[in-house]
Amino acid sequence: MQLILLSGGSGKRLWPLSNNARSKQFLPLLEKENGEMESMAQRVVRQAQEANLTNDITLATNASQLDIIQNQLGERVSVVTEPERRDTFPAIALAASYLKLKKKCEDDEVVVIMPCDPYTELEYFHTIARMVECVEKSVADLVLMGIKPTYPSAKYGYVVPFAEGEKYQIVKRFTEKPDVPTAEKLLEEGAYWNGGVFAFRLGYMMQIVRKYMQSENFEDTRARYSEFPKISFDYEVAEKAESVAVVPFNGEWKDLGTWNTLTDELHHASIGNAVMGSHCENTHVINELQLPLYVDGLKDAVVAASPDGIFVCAKKYSEDIKKAVEHLTPRPMYEERRWGTYRVIDDSEYADGNHSLTKSITLKPGKNISYQLHHHRSEVWTFVEGEGIFVLDGEEKHVKAGDTVVIPLEHYHAIKAITQLTFIEVQNGNPLVEEDIERFDYQWKMK
């Protein structure tokens, strides 16, 4: 079977730790049994493999998350990037096309779709295995996981089944995010939460894809991505399907999409360079800054600090953060890339119209930044840790801590780390945008 993990979101509910380039599923805040920290996405991939579900995992995402996925998950997953953010149906249609046209999977291959960030237990993945079994036995064209509700929630859609069955039930109808009184009635009917987990044969999905697009290769499908309707998978596929079954799951399952739910699962009250006084109660502090953070006298609160900003809030109001930060600058102040990380130290505009941006950039040993040039900015790099190989217009030289290099406007350049390499980059120009970059192939000579 093939597992497709959906990774979307713009990262505003867990601001300031999450942003457009580092959504909630990539925050390394969950502690493993050995004490190491991992992200929600890393946890889900690990659990799927520990449950012997499959090693054929494809992650469907947007281009802005590609580097952090490669950094955290490496070769454990294949990645399909959508050209633009649309909705779950086009994302799943593109991923299914990748399996069919790129990986050459057969039509009878079972495909499972699930979010990449549920906080759950191994039994969840054993339930997925039972869903696969239902598809293989042709119980229904489409099989869903039904989460046993713990309370009448207005945040989730509901799946209403016919009479109870031991292993699965035939679906009677769907109800989208009702009000609480309606949710109470749905629970009386034996309804489940729709957890966004679906199983089907690849051929079933490709029949739906071909209603919108006839294509013989994946590259063409991706280029024509905008031809898919901007609609959810639930509306376009699940609610129109003639044969749908649900497999129940009654275990630990949470959406850690808010500060309130996330802090419930943190093993420590403080993470990072933070000190909590003795008068704090049910308060969590996360500090990604190098500056120390001291907190005392807070009750039922969350404090989070990152290069993107500082957040102090009572937990019961923390869900309001999404609307509050919509107007803030879209430039991420911290990003994980395939080669390492960068952190914005200063971003200044001057009276003469010039703009400067200062970053601290760290490369992992053996990794390199692509051979590139910029049309609107010059750069000065000062190396503060490690050693590497710097190239300017095809000329390579060794660099180490204490060295400085100047990169004029429209000159080709790159850097490769020998050891862990950290340098301070000062950009000058206008406009200073990440899109001001042209990348080129380059064969390194020195080692």
What positions do the PLM features span?
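Conserved N-terminal catalytic core of the sugar/cofactor nucleotidyltransferase
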Residues: 2-5, 15-20, 28-115, 119-125, ...
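Short N-terminal binding/cap micro-motifs at the start of the first secondary-structure element
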Residues: 11-16, 23, 434
